[in-house]
UniProtKB/Swiss-Prot annotation:
One of its GO terms (molecular function) is toxin activity. Coiled coil: none annotated. Keywords: Disulfide bond, Hemostasis impairing toxin, Platelet aggregation inhibiting toxin, Secreted, Signal, Toxin. This is Ixodegrin-Ip.
Amino acid sequence: MNAAFIAALFILGALTLDAMAYSPTCEGKPCANNTDCKGSNLCQCRPPRGDDWRNFCSEY
């Protein structure tokens, strides 16, 4: 029982660290033009969507 519990915690911790490894340096930041968006070359200033009136940085 204890070994199964420890294994479950280890797997959960590994999944959590894997999820945290991606640090979004681009996603969701407000911008006025492409120079405001830092990160990879795919990071661009996108027009607003939905009911949000601000431009935002996104890789997609």
